[in-house]
């Protein structure tokens, strides 16, 4: 096993999306089930959630395709008390990523808002927040 390589920023973003998008899709599905049983007229809400889930599904497909093109494969995911650990191969090198629960929740909420068509302009990117160039 080779471990000295560090995945590029784009590679890390792909892996992060690969981990987050299935959770977002599960949340949309769970919310659809809850809304369909607790609202008198759930159809409009379910339509919005369905549209959001369809876009997220397309994004996940695109992420997987891009990962294949770039030689990235997640081979292990573990749910830890602190977050989600992923082990992946990036162009022949073994990498590890840990997403803390707070980060996962915050990022998932921002992505969900975007998929639902809500304004996310008040949320700064990591680069903007820490003034990274």
Predicted regions, residues:
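Short, well-ordered helical secondary-structure segments
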Residues: 1-2, 6-8, 36, 43-45, ...
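Short, flexible N-terminal segments of the mature chain
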Residues: 35-55
């Amino acid at each position: 096993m080779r471990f000295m390589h560090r995945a590029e920023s784009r590679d890390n973003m792909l892996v992060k999306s690969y981990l987050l998008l299935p959770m977002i899709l599960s949340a949309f599905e769970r919310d659809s089930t809850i809304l369909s049983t607790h609202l008198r007229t759930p159809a409009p809400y379910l339509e919005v959630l369905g549209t959001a889930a369809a876009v997220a599904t397309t994004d996940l497909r695109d992420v997987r395709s891009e990962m294949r093109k770039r030689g990235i494969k997640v081979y292990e995911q573990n749910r830890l008390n602190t977050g989600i650990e992923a082990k992946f191969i990036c162009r022949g090198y073994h990498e590890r990523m840990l997403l803390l629960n707070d980060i996962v929740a915050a990022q998932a909420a921002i992505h969900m808002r975007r998929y639902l068509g809500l304004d996310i302009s008040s949320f700064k990117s990591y680069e903007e927040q820490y003034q990274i160039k």
